[in-house]
Structure formats: C-alpha cells, structure tokens
Amino acid sequence: MPPPRTRGAESGGAGPSADLFRQYLREIGRIPLLTAAEEVDLARRVEAGLFAEEKLGGAADLDSQLAVDLDRLVVMGRMAKRRLIESNLRLVVSVAKRYVGRGLTMLDLVQEGNLGLIRAVEKFDYARGYKFSTYATWWIRQAMSRALADQARTIRVPVHVVELINRVVRVQRRMLQERGYEPTAEEVAVHLELTPERVLEVLRLAQEPVSLHAPVGEEDDVALGDLIEDGDAASPVESAAFFLRCEHLEAVLSTLGERERKVVQLRYGLADGRPRTLEEIGRIFGVTRERIRQIESKTLNKLRDHAFADQLRGYLD
C-alpha cells in the first residue's frame, strides 16, 4: 500500500495531496501489528518464496510436481512479503518525521522509506533473532538519507563524496573497535583499495567543521553532516547484532556477581557502546590482564548455561 505518488505536499498541509496522505495514514493505522512469532513465520515464508523463485528461474527441466510446489511457495512468499511490509508502514512514517524540513516532503520521504522497508524484508535473516523493526529502521534511514542527497535540487557536495566519507568513517570505526587503536590512513586505504592520500583527504573533509556544514539541499537547509548518519558506523546487520547482544546480555547481568557484571559491561561496551581491552579493565580493577581474562572466561561459561544460551552462542563462542 504505497502512499500517494504526488510530490510537493507536506503532511499536515492543505489540498488534495495532503488529504490523500491523511487517508493513507488512516488506512495503514488500521493494519494490525505483528507479534514476534508472526514476523518469524512470515520471514520464513518470504525466504522460502525467494528460494523457490530462484530455483524456478535457474532450472530448465524441473519435475512437474516440483514445479507446482515451487510455484506455490513463490505465491505464499509474495503474500507473506506483502503482509510484512504493510504491517510496518507505520514505522516508515515514524522515521520520516525525523527528516522533514531537510529538502524533501513527507510524501517523498515516506515513498523512499517504503523502498528501504521492502529491501529490509528481502534481506531480513530471521534465524539471527533480531527484532525486525530494529533491522528495518536502518534500511529505511539509509533510503531516506540517500534520497536527500540524490533528489535535492541543489547539490553542492557531490553524493559520491558523502558516500565515500561514510565508507571511510565506517571502516575507521570498525577497525578501532576490533583493534583497540585508531587505524592509520594506510591501513584504511588497504581495506578500501584507495591511496593513503585519498583517505587523508576524505578524513580532512569529514573533520573540518566548515566542510561538514556545507549545504547539500536547497535553501541551505541540509548540511553534509546531516547525511552522515550516526548509524553508518556499522551495517544494518552489525548494528542489529550489537543491540540484540546488549539486550540479551543485560537480561542475565542480574544473575552475576558485582565484579563479573562490571567486567562484562566494560568488555562488551554495554554501558557506553565502547568495548574495553583486557588491559584497560585490568587497570580499572587494579589487577593483571590475565586475571581479567580468567574472570571473563568464567563469566562467559555461566552465560552459556543461561536460558538465552542459544541466542547468545554466536557472540560468546
């Protein structure tokens, strides 16, 4: 159920376009929300349908009964996809409200966000245990941010520059988290197949206040910094995994001793999003790195025996 494809109308305004949009909001407001179990069931059907569609397209001489079965899976998958999309259209509107006034109308933002939602439905991996809304929000925001750069009439900061800044910053932050120190321009360059000089140039652009405030949209109402989302430090999958890990680990912290709980919080960055090294935690407690490693190992073994063990296994092993 796409919104009216009429450009140039803000939500809450007057005229036919605004009336159509209000009608659209009323219609999607009547669509029941899904339970977590329903989301998983629909996601399974979507995955099966996509698999069946691929099989049908890649095999020339399928058994007739198998072809019928695959056709049925395709139909069921498309029905599930539609329901999963329609049940989350309100999420798109909610995200779109954060971007109003940056160069695109509410109608345009919702239209672009719906494309991101469709992509999220197609890419969603229910087996990982993520909340679909957490995962989909990243794709919706990505679609809207891209649209702001692509569709604004006056773009003085090229879209490819915005995207390159996001790529460099994303890799830089990921390497920082993995290694515990800020990577050099050479290390980032190797990862992105760029020259160190190009990486330094991009980093200078990202760090200069004037450059980050350079106008991107019309009437100078969109700045380059607006298009560098905080979430671009990680992909949708990585971010959803991080939040899921925090959610499940927090659920078992109350079963740990005070020191064990603090070690886990520091090690995984549960309090502030910044994981600490064994050395850093050792300095905080006034003990050796090896002692912290022993505490961590003992604590993780406890967590593996917890009711959430299956969900946590990918993070603790």
From Swiss-Prot:
PANTHER family reported for this sequence: RNA POLYMERASE PRINCIPAL SIGMA FACTOR HRDA, RNA POLYMERASE SIGMA FACTOR RPO
Molecular functions per Gene Ontology: DNA binding; sigma factor activity
GO cellular component, one term: cytoplasm
Pfam families: Sigma70_r1_2 (PF00140), Sigma70_r2 (PF04542), Sigma70_r3 (PF04539), Sigma70_r4 (PF04545)
Role according to the record: Sigma factors are initiation factors that promote the attachment of RNA polymerase to specific initiation sites and are then released. This sigma factor is the primary sigma factor during exponential growth.
Localisation: Cytoplasm
Record-annotated DNA-binding residue ranges: 278-297
Motif, Interaction with polymerase core subunit RpoC: chain positions: 108-111
Cross-referenced InterPro entries: RNA_pol_sigma-70_dom, RNA_pol_sigma70, RNA_pol_sigma70_r1_2, RNA_pol_sigma70_r2, RNA_pol_sigma70_r3, RNA_pol_sigma70_r4, RNA_pol_sigma_r2, RNA_pol_sigma_r3/r4-like
Family statement: Belongs to the sigma-70 factor family. RpoD/SigA subfamily.
Protein's UniProt name: RNA polymerase sigma factor SigA
Organism: Kitasatospora aureofaciens (Streptomyces aureofaciens)
Keywords for this protein: Cytoplasm, DNA-binding, Sigma factor, Transcription, Transcription regulation
Annotated stretches, region: Sigma-70 factor domain-3: 163-239
A Gene Ontology biological process term: DNA-templated transcription initiation
Annotated stretches, region: Sigma-70 factor domain-2: 84-154
Lineage, top ranks: Bacteria, Bacillati, Actinomycetota, Actinomycetes, Kitasatosporales
Region (Sigma-70 factor domain-4) residue spans: 252-305
